[in-house]
Amino acid sequence: MQLQVFWTGLEYTCRLLGITTAAVLIGVGTETFLQGQFKSLAFYLLFTGAAVSICEGAYFVAQLLAICFQCQPGSLADRVREKAHWLGCFQKFLAYLLLSVACFLHPVLVWHVTIPGSMLIITGLAYFLLSKRKKRKAAPEVLASPEQYTDPSSSAVSTTGSGDTEQTYTFHGALKEGPSSLFIHMKSILKGTKKPSALQPPNTLMELSLEPADSLAKKKQVHFEDNLVRIVPSLAEGLDDGDSEPEETTSDTTPIIPPPQAPLFLSSLTATGLF
């Protein structure tokens, strides 16, 4: 609490020093111009006083406008007011130090110019100290309400709650219509990778509980809703015939060793009737 009071007091001190320095610069510049001996220095002092007045006066103008008019949050006027209210303190420190250099070039000839130069240095150092203050932290974001995401390509809808660990995924038409995908799916079914008994009616709901290895992790439930494909028997048989290789058929009654054949000479004699 005491630190906050210190920073607030330092801020108002910097504003007061800035306005006072601008007034001194304009006053000394006007007097130097009226003397007519150092007109270039007089113009420089007047220019420096005007620049400091703009930098410091923007804060007071913003405060006055905030009292007279109510700006909507996020509007252009509100952003301009915030910029004027929190103009860079470190940038002011550098600018005031650079502007004070010319005030010490001829301190013997124009001794009274060292007064606004010293005030510029003091004001710059005060702003440098103010720049070390930490910025106010933004308020914590409010927990977002559950969002819903839709993927048009797969017609999948996912609903995720920020406070709930349950996730639900719904898939409509998970299998794409086409000869390639249908062929691959039916081929896997016919080969036995997916038994017919495991098939369920269309639009059934399967619940799978996923438990991570870490015992401290929360349980998640994933729900899948899938549409099954009905297989036409004729098309399945045609695909099975196209994929299956020709099989060799053997008979159990076929003898393993063929009977011996009669010699060719004896068979010819028998045919002529000699025996």
Curated annotation (Swiss-Prot):
Transmembrane segments: 16-36, 41-61, 86-105, 109-131
GO CC annotation, single: membrane
Keyword match Membrane: yes
Extent of Acidic residues compositional bias: 238-250
Membrane disposition: Multi-pass membrane protein
Keywords: Membrane, Transmembrane, Transmembrane helix
Major localization class: membrane
Subcellular location: Membrane
InterPro entries cross-referenced by the UniProt entry: TMEM72 (IPR032055)
Biased composition (Polar residues): 147-163
Renumbered residue ranges of the record's region Disordered: 141-163, 236-262
Name assigned to this protein: Transmembrane protein 72
Species this protein is from: Homo sapiens
